[in-house]
Amino acid sequence: SRGLGDVYKRQVLATTLRNLSYNENARIVTEKHTVKLPLRVNWGGGWSDTPPYCNENGGTVLNVAILLNGQKPVEVTLEKLSEKKIVFDSRDMDVHGEFDTIEPLQATGDPFDPFALQKACLLACGIIPKEGSSLDEVLDRLGGGFEMHSEVTNVPKGSGLGTSSILSAACVKAVFELSLIHIS
């Protein structure tokens, strides 16, 4: 049987997916952009901001951003490609994937997919529609394909330093700063 938390997570996911919108005005307007972000240390209240707990009890968390040996260890680089494809490359996980059709990019439900986070970013930012369309149409509109490199340097998974959430933020920030989402 599934617990209340699982039911709640499915409801939140379903609501989020319903509310995603495809941004038909997005364009690639620069050739390459890199985002580097710091890590996060939780000083108090950890997990009290996580549903369903925070919905029932409220939540307050105190975090601080930190550098690792003076460096921002979470990095995402987006680079425009002339080819009609999307490439994901996770250097720290040593995985590489190339996509020339849209359906695999729209499939974000597999928690073991090494690119689930990157795919979710493209859906959440409106770069890829949640259903339908073709990758050729999307990339024609954007002005080309692109490669997304990601890397978390010298930080083990599960360290408690926020690498997954910060990598998510870096992906979104890189998409916006590459001006895939061009706001006129």
Question: What are these model-derived regions, one by one?
Answer:
Residues 3-8:
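Short, small-residue-biased leader/transition segments that mark boundaries at the very start
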Residues 19-29:
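Short linear interaction motifs
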Residues 26-28, 48, 71:
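Long, Pro/Ser/Thr-rich low-complexity/intrinsically disordered regulatory tracts in eukaryotic proteins
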Residues 28, 34-36:
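Short, surface-exposed loop/turn motifs at beta-strand boundaries within globular domains
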Residues 34, 66-180, 184:
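Anion-binding (especially nucleotide phosphate/pyrophosphate-binding) glycine-rich loop
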Residues 36-53:
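Conserved SET/PR-domain catalytic core that frames the SAM/AdoMet-binding pocket
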Residues 51-66:
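Short Gly/aromatic-enriched secondary-structure transition segments
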